[in-house]
């Protein structure tokens, strides 16, 4: 992220977050369609819902809660969510070796790194200096399991993809709330 106006930094970060969230949602759907029998999907989704590491972070759970937090807090939460996936996504390309939707899986890590850098640039702008490591936890998710013949591995990956999708949705929401708060525009209704 070269030096640019704050509005451009926010616009770029939101676009990157939206793209990653859509990629995560498409990947989740493709994995589900390919590996999870239709009759099991709903019950598995409910069972997996409680296992997202991000649920242990005291972060806002929706747009209304996000609006109660400062921009710096929202950036820190977004950064934490993004960083928690940097390790696990490096294994995604092995899980989706012959996937059409996930043909770009090798680039997911780079896209996450770009978003991480964009969030750090926003933090520098808003904090007038370098981002403080502060409360950034270094906890992360497990790696994706590349053994797709095992039911346990399939369920683990399904749960991880569900968490990945949820976490990217949260990061996108936080960035959009901040952008709308600072730069009122027609695309703020979401």
Swiss-Prot record:
GO terms for biological process: animal organ development; growth hormone receptor signaling pathway; positive regulation of growth; positive regulation of receptor signaling pathway via JAK-STAT; response to nutrient levels. GO terms for cellular component: extracellular space. It is found in: Secreted. InterPro entries: 4_helix_cytokine-like_core (IPR009079), Somatotropin (IPR034975), Somatotropin/Prolactin (IPR001400), Somatotropin_CS (IPR018116). Disulfide bonds join 52-163, 180-188. Zn(2+) binds at residues 19, 172. GO terms for molecular function: growth factor activity; growth hormone receptor binding; hormone activity; metal ion binding. Belongs to the somatotropin/prolactin family. Plays an important role in growth control. Its major role in stimulating body growth is to stimulate the liver and other tissues to secrete IGF1. It stimulates both the differentiation and proliferation of myoblasts. It also stimulates amino acid uptake and protein synthesis in muscle and other tissues. This is Somatotropin. It comes from Vicugna pacos (Alpaca).
